[in-house]
Amino acid sequence: MIKSDPDVEVYALGKHIRMSAHKARRVIDQIRGRPYEETLMILELMPYRACYPILKLVYSAAANASHNMGFNETALIISQAEVNEGTITKKLKPRARGRSFAIKRPTCHITIVLQDISKDKKYFIWLRKYGWIYKDKYTDVRERYLYMMDHMLYRNRMTWINREMIWPYRDSEVLWDKK
């Protein structure tokens, strides 16, 4: 069950979507934790059939955020996304010699939760590879500074030269000495 903070989170729920939960999870795992605009680009370019209903749900959640809560769409991220199995529709297909085969049509329930990071105080500014980093983890200014330097190294904005981290185009300016 997804618990949401009503001040900064908005969700959209799609029930009885006619596809396998396994196939929908393949797409949901690609968009979880990403910004709203990047999610739209990913969903429009992925070649899976599951992308279209998920794209409609993301649009619906963004419309809920802008209309009901007044959030700006550029500050939204997909904070939570989950896929649950729904009911299975069973039909009988007639076959030769009076027999029949069962046809199972699975459904799934998809929940998309968008979060406005401009109004949320818990999230740290910099985005890392594995998701958003909580601000509570860093207690003093030095730890935040070290994390910012690590982030700049990760994004290839800084390089290591002789155990010192410097800007790529300014060889004389040393920011931090690694000891």
UniProtKB/Swiss-Prot annotation:
InterPro entries: Ribosomal_uL22, Ribosomal_uL22_bac/chlpt-type, Ribosomal_uL22_bac/org-type, Ribosomal_uL22_CS, Ribosomal_uL22_sf. One of its GO terms (cellular component) is chloroplast. SUPFAM superfamilies: Ribosomal protein L22 (SSF54843). One of its GO terms (molecular function) is structural constituent of ribosome. PROSITE patterns: RIBOSOMAL_L22 (PS00464). One of its GO terms (biological process) is translation. Keywords: Chloroplast, Plastid, Ribonucleoprotein, Ribosomal protein, RNA-binding, rRNA-binding. It is found in: Plastid, Chloroplast. Transmembrane segments: none annotated. Part of the 50S ribosomal subunit. Belongs to the universal ribosomal protein uL22 family. HAMAP family: Ribosomal_uL22_B. This protein binds specifically to 23S rRNA. NCBIfam families: rplV_bact. This is Large ribosomal subunit protein uL22c. It comes from Ranunculus macranthus (Large buttercup). The lineage of its organism: Eukaryota, Viridiplantae, Streptophyta, Embryophyta, Tracheophyta.
